[in-house]
Amino acid sequence: MALRTIDALELAGKRVFIRVDFNVPLDPQGRVTDDARIRAALPTIRHAIQAKAKVILASHLGRPKGKPEDRQKLTLEPAAVRLSELLSQDVILADDCVGDGVKKLVRDLKDGHVLLLENLRFHPEEEKNDEAFARELASLADVWVNDAFGTAHRAHASTAGMARFVKEKAAGFLVQKEVEYLGKALGSPARPFVAIVGGAKVSDKIKVLENLIAKADAICVGGAMAYTFLKAQGVPVGKSLVEEDKLELARQILERAEARKVDLLLPVDHVCGAEPKETAERVVVNDRAIPDGLMGLDIGPKTLDRYRQRIAAAKTVFWNGPMGLFEQKPWSEGTFGVAKAMAASPAVTVVGGGDSAAAVEQAGLVDAMKHVSTGGGASLEFIEGRELPGVKACEE
């Protein structure tokens, strides 16, 4: 099924409801501390403004629990202020996302003007994908556009439910870019195709690994999950984090990779500490085996070198999950080393959301990558080969 995109629709004079992802971090004063998600939605919003649509934006923010203070803490007002600055035009903020007051604001909205509805999750019906709530949201719209890839894996009222009750629907440019890059990296990659997979647990990445074994030429494994694989091969891992109940599964994954002639690379040296703390002494262990009393907290320099060489020789590189406890400086070299190697590569470089995206952002290398996914859970499910409700709703 082909994705229908916003530029294929006639928008002039229509009420265009765009589901965006403005779930942005705020400081204690309620100011936006990172506007990346707001900026990511600008191409779609600007397109609708220039097409003289009546632009209605909707998003969630945080996880409201129905407490009165949530209304102050989790209001979308800071996002409205920042968006107004970025667009250099007024953004009207509604005090709710449904109800008579909102209907009046929509009725009075002029072509090319922007209305931001208040936090969708102030209504529990949003996450329950309640039909009556979805119909009420749909009554505000002639056109429904999904540009919130970060929530595309959730079948909520605004991300999937209301699409059934709106005649015209499409994906925004951000969702289009996500599907294009993630789809291309996994569907028809330029080869050699190298995947870098990290993170703490094998159990979190089983489906990802299975899908990548079917598609990649090589998989470089880092993060704490590497110790479960090493232990499955009989390599001593000291007191590193290991999922004991996943050792058999790790063996099966290694066998499957071998059967498919996929190089599954594991660390050959490690950066270790006695405990996962910034203050712990940093010990480089120049061997696959980790001595008793130490735990692996990052890939070692030889491993990073091997992974760099694979990245340099690749035509497509996909990265999901850090190589170590990168939030703490002593254990961050592996993760930032991978980020720098990808940034220096002429290959199609795709970073699959979550911690890897945070690391790339921290390293200031976002613009050096072909694509950094804005979806953590959504990009993970996409890589696993699952259907995303928020994307399916945009298909023709």
From Swiss-Prot:
ATP binds at K205, G296, E327, G353, G354, D355, S356. CDD domains: Phosphoglycerate_kinase. GO terms for cellular component: cytosol. Keywords: ATP-binding, Cytoplasm, Glycolysis, Kinase, Nucleotide-binding, Transferase. SUPFAM superfamilies: Phosphoglycerate kinase. The keyword Glycosyltransferase does not apply. It is an enzyme of class 2 (transferase). Its EC number is 2.7.2.3. Substrate binds at D21, F22, N23, R37, H60, L61, G62, R63, R121, R154. Its main location: cytoplasm. Pathway: Carbohydrate degradation; glycolysis; pyruvate from D-glyceraldehyde 3-phosphate: step 2/5. It is found in: Cytoplasm. GO terms for biological process: gluconeogenesis; glycolytic process. Pfam families: PGK. It catalyses: (2R)-3-phosphoglycerate + ATP = (2R)-3-phospho-glyceroyl phosphate + ADP. It comes from the Bacteria. GO terms for molecular function: ADP binding; ATP binding; phosphoglycerate kinase activity. Belongs to the phosphoglycerate kinase family. Monomer. This is Phosphoglycerate kinase.
